[in-house]
Structures are given as C-alpha cells and as structure tokens.
Regions:
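Post-signal-peptide N-terminal segment of Sec-exported extracytoplasmic proteins
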Residues: 36-77, 125-138, 143
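Positively charged n-region of N-terminal signal peptides that target proteins for export
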Residues: 1-4
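Surface-exposed binding patches on compact interaction domains or structured appendages
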Residues: 73-101
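Short, surface-exposed loop/turn segments at beta-strand-coil junctions that are enriched for proline
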Residues: 110-115
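A short beta-strand micro-motif common to beta-rich folds, especially ectodomain repeats
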Residues: 118-126
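Short strand-edge motifs at loop-to-beta-strand transitions and within beta-strands
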Residues: 51, 101-107
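Short, low-complexity, disordered segments immediately C-terminal to signal peptides
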Residues: 19-35
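C-terminal motif of bacterial Sec signal peptides marking the signal peptidase cleavage site
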Residues: 14-17
C-alpha cells in the first residue's frame, strides 16, 4: 500500500511539473506575439473626435470628415470602421497613412426616419496604440410637418 501511494505521489509530481513547463511555454509564446504587435504599432493624434451638426430636418444628410494624424514611426493601417447605427456610414482610408501624414474618416449620417436628439458613434480598428478613440456625431433632427 505504501508503495502504491509513493508511486502515485511521484507520478503526480511529474505531471504537475510538466504542466508548469507548458504554462511557461504558453506565456513565452504570448509574450513574443505581444512584442510583435507592439513592433507593428504606431500612434495617432485626432484633430477632432466629436462633430456637433446642430439642428437639421428629417431626411437631410450630414457629411463630416474626422481628421487625424499619424504621429508614430510606422504606417497607420485602419482595418475597420463601423457605426452604432445603419443610418451612419463611415469610409476609412484604403491605403496606410504614413508617419507624419494627415488623413480623415468620412462619415455620412442619413436622418431619414429619425427625430429628436441623435448621438451616433463610430468605432475604428487600427494598429494604433493606444487604440483609436471612438468618434461621435451629435445633433437634433426636426420631424417633417405632416
């Protein structure tokens, strides 16, 4: 019986030590991936993050260019831009924005079927660190007289 317990303890110790090595390898792999991501990142400075379009009439469209500058040393790649509502359509630059260059994300808000206070958010995915801030359109839509 003692022999059986001793064998179980030895096997348990071996299994636990293998698991520690596995966790170390996983941690090392994660660290390498993080270092690679950080090598490929850049920084961005937003010239404007909020646009207040005032009061418009239902059915009007608002178009605005949110401007930004790549302040890092690597090209800024915007992989995705999407809005909180289908009535708002962002258009991102198709080409990378080189260091020192200024560019914009064009946003069009269609007020058809909308009324009252409007707050639309635009979310941008890029290789910027810290991440690209959310963009916001604010305003009022007056309902058409029926």
């Amino acid at each position: 019986m003692i022999r059986y317990i001793l064998i179980c303890l030895i096997l348990g110790t071996l299994l636990l030590s293998c698991d520690v090595r596995r966790k170390d390898k996983v941690a090392d792999d994660a660290m390498q991936k993080m270092e690679q991501v950080l090598k490929d990142t850049t920084t961005v400075e937003l010239i404007d993050t909020v646009y207040k379009f005032g009061t418009i009439t239902e059915g009007d469209k608002v178009e605005y260019n949110f401007r930004f500058k790549n302040t890092g040393k690597k090209p800024l790649v915007i992989s995705n831009a999407h809005a909180s509502c289908g009535c708002t359509v962002p258009e991102k630059p198709e080409k990378p924005v080189m260091p020192g260059e200024t560019s914009f994300i064009k946003v069009v808000f269609n007020s058809k079927g909308k009324s009252g206070h409007q707050e639309k958010s635009i979310f941008v995915s890029s290789n910027a660190r810290p991440s690209f801030p959310d963009l916001t359109l604010l305003g009022e839509v007056k309902r058409l007289a029926q």
